[in-house]
UniProtKB/Swiss-Prot annotation:
Belongs to the quinolinate synthase family. Type 1 subfamily. It is found in: Cytoplasm. This is Quinolinate synthase. The keyword Membrane does not apply. GO terms for biological process: 'de novo' NAD biosynthetic process from L-aspartate. It comes from Burkholderia pseudomallei (strain 668). InterPro entries: NadA, NadA_sf, Quinolinate_synth_A_type1. Its cofactor is [4Fe-4S] cluster. Coiled coil: none annotated.
Length: 378
């Protein structure tokens, strides 16, 4: 594997008008609500969704109240791939995206005629922050012979510079296909996900050195100790996690794939190495099973995130209601950038649709998704 001689930081100084950094994000997380306030806000939001001909599209990592509200109102709670498809195909006039900014941008790119709102436009992503378009363009220009594959967790401008966009649920399959065709790849921005895919496919990948603030904090040593404490538990790991964590996994997969594994595996106890927001959906999908948060640090240490994204935490019932009431926090993407960015997104969606048809025809969806057999071995 080749790797870029480059170091990037997710909490770098931000340009004027850029989304907020880690500390400011935590400061902007809305206060918790008492039950009466929560119920009143949910009722208000339901009425506003109808009034505005809007649908709520939420990620698995946002607050459980938002996920429940999306389910109750005919919206969507999903990973970034399904969020993109759902928003594109839904007939709502307005898409309200509860997640981080790149998700809102992707929704706008795929649905240019729809209004796209977000509870807080400052909600960003460490991977997005760590891959600024000017530096990334220079990096790509230095290697013009390579196919540029970017993760969904990037800005619209970075996507516009790419040949392919991928999510964690389809990235391995797309890179394997490109490798089979003899293509050399630039991968950005997550080095852990890229390294996992490279080891699985053998592809020639030149890596951008970004990482997720949440997943980068999981500790292999501490996870191994927890595994011995709960020897009957299966370990579920998102591939944005460090190699030492992935090596201990029983299942490595996207958020949707990890939820599927929690439902379908016979185990009654799971250790989960991804953002703790996913536990809401896991508990609903697999009632009676026990889910334990994977450790982000030792008992005497501190962590940056404690397994929760500060920018995801900025999404709340209070600012969702405010956005619907006032019609602000609308996402806009420059037309030329949106047009270029749509190509790699559509390529991914088309590939995913064809891949799903092939797998369904073979009758072997579980094995093809690598959910259950030796997936932790890299």
């Amino acid at each position: 594997m080749q790797s870029a001689i480059k170091s990037v930081e997710y909490d770098r100084p931000l340009a004027a008008g850029a989304a907020c950094g880690v500390g400011e994000a935590w400061a902007k997380v809305p206060d918790a609500l008492v039950p009466d306030e929560r119920d009143a806000l949910k009722a208000r939001i339901k009425a506003l969704l109808v009034r505005e001909k809007a649908v709520l599209v939420a990620h698995y990592y946002v607050d459980a109240d938002l996920q429940a509200l999306a389910d109750e109102t005919g919206g969507c709670v999903a990973d970034s791939l399904e969020m993109a498809r759902f928003g594109r195909d839904h007939d709502a006039h307005t898409l309200v995206v509860a997640g981080v900014r790149f998700m809102g941008e992707t929704a706008k790119i795929l649905s240019p005629g729809k209004r796209v709102l977000m509870p807080d436009l400052d909600a960003t992503c460490s991977l997005d922050l760590g891959c600024p378009i000017d530096e990334f363009s220079q990096f790509c220009d230095a290697h013009p012979e390579r196919t540029v594959v970017v993760y969904a967790n990037t800005s619209a401008a970075v996507k516009a510079r790419a040949d392919w966009m991928v999510t964690s649920s389809i990235g391995l399959e797309i890179v394997a296909d490109l490798h089979a065709r003899g293509e050399k790849i630039i991968w950005a921005p997550d080095r852990h996900l890229g390294g996992y895919i490279q080891k699985k496919t053998g592809a020639d990948m030149l890596m951008w050195q970004g990482s997720c603030l949440v997943h980068d904090e999981f500790k292999g040593i501490e996870l191994d100790l927890l595994r011995h404490e709960y020897p009957d538990a299966k370990i579920l790991v998102h591939p944005e996690s460090p190699e030492g964590v992935v090596a201990l996994a029983d299942v490595v997969g996207s958020t949707t794939q990890l939820i599927d594994a929690a439902v379908k595996l016979d185990a009654q106890r799971f250790i989960v190495a991804t953002d703790l927001g996913i536990l809401h959906k896991m508990r609903l999908a697999a009632p009676g099973k026990t889910f334990i948060e994977a450790p982000t640090a030792g008992n005497s240490a501190t962590c940056k995130s404690c397994a929760h994204c500060p920018w995801m935490a900025m999404n709340a019932l209070s600012n969702l209601a405010d956005v619907l009431e006032r019609g602000h926090n609308e996402i806009f993407v420059e037309a030329a950038i949106a047009q270029r960015a749509r190509m790699p997104i559509d390529r991914m969606l088309d590939f995913a649709a064809r891949h799903k048809q092939r797998v369904q025809a073979s009758g072997d969806l579980q094995r093809d998704q690598a959910l259950f057999a030796n997936v932790g071995a890299a």
